[in-house]
């Protein structure tokens, strides 16, 4: 963490290079430094469960089939994803001792508030900014037990049992949030090298994928005598690199798959809402985005996946469940050209 002196220097430098007035009091600069620290603490606790969940949402449902397909076969899928929100990640506790400028308005020393994937409960935090009182309503969660969103996927079969995979979701508006994912990958059939497996309709495949997840949530709408602070939209940006192994067994028109998934995700956070009126005085959104780099993180996940795929002529219906820390399900209707 930056020292108090370093925080004030950062704010001062930003003021100088942005061409803004530098007539603000030392008290204002100190209070803004404290407010930035408080916002940073709350941001981490609030959005991290949602970005963890986004990894699960994007990680499952990549593999249609583990078997080797014919050259230039094309499959297009329309998918509906179901993410089951766990109780353990819906809320977190805050204490007055967690904050430097703010405190719980009710007079309590601690309170429980929702994460981004929690309920719609809210409390008020209060403090003084350069001697002027401010009052902040904590952000709501999405207040859903199951998060449902659609996405498209596709696969193109190339030479030697290799396929190119793609996944794309337009920006989907969920309750008080937005979600978007895109990604691509390569799958290679391994059972082609073991004739005994092919003879028994047992298939093996290895897959490597990359996906980008972007989740955004309504955040803190803070009104002050200096204008709106412009931190009312918080985004989590996640890059996920994934490897998985799948095995399947064919039973006439049914293919049953089981898989093991391992991935590494890089998490970044950014304020993406409209800049507030305070930007005429201090480039607060820029300063906060620089400070948000302090909570960037990298995490590894391991999960299992089971899937069933049923063929009706050129149409396939597939249901997939991935499980680990979270549970995520995907229902896909595919057409094979």
Residue ranges and their predicted role:
Residues 70-72, 145-150, 178-184, 200, ...:
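Residues that define the transmembrane beta-barrel architecture of outer-membrane proteins
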Residues 160-164, 193-196, 253-256, 312-319, ...:
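Repeated loop/turn-to-beta-strand initiation elements of outer-membrane beta-barrel proteins
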Residues 65-67, 76-78, 152-158, 184-190, ...:
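Residues on the lipid-exposed face of transmembrane beta-strands in outer-membrane beta-barrel proteins
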Residues 89-91, 128-144, 173-179, 212-240, ...:
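Extracellular/periplasm-exposed beta-strand and loop segments of Gram-negative cell-envelope proteins
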Residues 64-72, 87, 176, 191-204, ...:
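Short loop/turn motifs that connect adjacent beta-strands in outer-membrane beta-barrel proteins
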Residues 80-84, 168-172, 190, 208-214, ...:
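Transmembrane beta-strands of outer-membrane beta-barrel pores
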Residues 23-124, 199:
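Outer-membrane beta-barrel biogenesis signature
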Residues 1-28:
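Bacterial Sec-dependent N-terminal signal peptides
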């Amino acid at each position: 963490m930056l020292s108090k002196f370093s925080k004030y220097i950062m704010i001062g430098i930003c003021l100088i290079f942005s061409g803004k007035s530098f007539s603000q009091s030392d008290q204002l600069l100190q209070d803004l430094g404290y407010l930035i620290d408080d916002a940073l603490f709350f941001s981490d606790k609030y959005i991290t469960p949602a970005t963890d969940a986004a990894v699960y949402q994007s990680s499952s449902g990549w593999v249609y089939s583990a078997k080797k397909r014919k050259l230039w076969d094309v499959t297009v899928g329309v998918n509906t994803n179901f993410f089951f929100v766990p109780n353990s990640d819906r809320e977190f506790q805050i204490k007055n001792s967690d904050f430097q400028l703010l405190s719980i308005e009710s007079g309590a020393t601690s309170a429980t508030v929702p994460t981004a994937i929690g309920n719609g409960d809210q409390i008020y935090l209060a403090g003084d900014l350069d001697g002027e009182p401010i009052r902040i309503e904590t952000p709501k969660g999405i207040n859903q037990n199951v998060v449902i969103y659609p996405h498209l996927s596709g696969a193109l079969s190339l030479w030697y049992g290799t396929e190119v995979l793609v996944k794309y979701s337009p920006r989907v508006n969920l309750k008080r949030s937005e979600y978007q994912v895109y990604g691509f990958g390569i799958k290679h059939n391994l059972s082609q090298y073991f004739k005994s497996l092919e003879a028994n309709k047992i298939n093996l495949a290895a897959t490597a994928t990359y996906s980008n997840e972007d989740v955004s949530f309504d955040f803190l709408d803070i009104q002050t005598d200096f204008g709106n602070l412009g931190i009312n939209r918080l985004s989590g940006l996640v890059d996920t690199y994934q490897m998985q192994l799948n095995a399947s067994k064919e039973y006439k028109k049914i293919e049953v798959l089981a898989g093991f998934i391992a991935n590494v995700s890089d998490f970044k956070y950014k304020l993406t809402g409209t800049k507030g009126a305070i930007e005429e005085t201090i480039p607060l959104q820029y300063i906060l985005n620089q400070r948000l780099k302090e909570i960037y993180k990298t995490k590894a996940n391991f999960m299992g996946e089971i899937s069933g795929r049923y063929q009706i002529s050129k149409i396939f219906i597939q249901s997939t469940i991935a499980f680990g820390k979270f549970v995520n399900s995907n229902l896909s209707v595919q057409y094979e050209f």
